[in-house]
Amino acid sequence: MKREVSKVEKALTALLAMHSGSGKAPIGTPALLIVTLVYLGLMLSVAPEALARLLWFALYPIVMAPVVGEQYGRVFVRSLAVLPFVILIGIFNPLYQTEVAFRIGSVTISRGWVTFMSILVRALLSVQALLLLVDSVGFAGLCSGLRRIGVPALLTTQLMMVYRYMTVLLQESLDMTRARQARGYRGRNMSLSMWGTYCGQLFLRTVARSERIHRAMLARGFNGSMPVLAAGEVWNRRDTVTLVAVTCVFALFRWGPLPALFAFG
């Protein structure tokens, strides 16, 4: 059971670290959020067969990672968590798209494999961009930035609530795991029936604690919105210049006459 505790503790620590972020965002939160949205929009609009052009967009997370105080290798490893889902989505492309895309010596690469790789690259780059955004401004900053660019308060409040209650769920899970270890179950696997009891008790404990938190919020004047999400940095000239410059670079990646990184696409 020691291994399970370690996983829960690591997940809880990572989730709590997401609240405020590193605080090393090079520009204001709304501007960085818009930059990320522009990046995702232009990157995802690249044709599936244009894999060489798509690879140029990998420069953004590689350059952005050290700017916000992160190591790109760590961000890349974290983004690999989506690979099983992406592979499940695109693995059948080579079976349906059998047209020849290019040849490497005597090896023929079909169009299906190119589009499959394109799906993988898009997913990894999208997750890496979002990870860098959250790591730099934090989840609270992200919700505040969404609020400032016009996203309805109801949605930003719901996002913040989901994040808060995820920490509640993990904290209750950690407490139950420690209580089980204290009663002599260290290192022993749980049976299926015990897992059912564990999940049921975890649900009941989480709901009960959530109700206590909600009553405490109401006692402090909560009216459905979080005032802290409406606050944020003042937009300045640096944000405007950076947004325009980075957008031009992304537009160059998308439509410019760039040389191919590889001999295909």
Please tell me what each predicted stretch does.
Residues A25-G28, E70-R74, R103, V107-R111, ...:
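Membrane-helix interfacial "entry" motifs
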Residues F76-R183:
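Juxtamembrane/interface alpha-helical elements of multi-pass membrane proteins
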Residues R53, Q71-S79:
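Interfacial helix-loop-helix linkers and transmembrane-helix boundary segments
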Residues A58-L59, Q71, I87, A129:
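Generic hydrophobic, aliphatic-rich segments that mediate packing or membrane embedding
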Residues M1-V68, Q171-G265:
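Transmembrane alpha-helix interface motif
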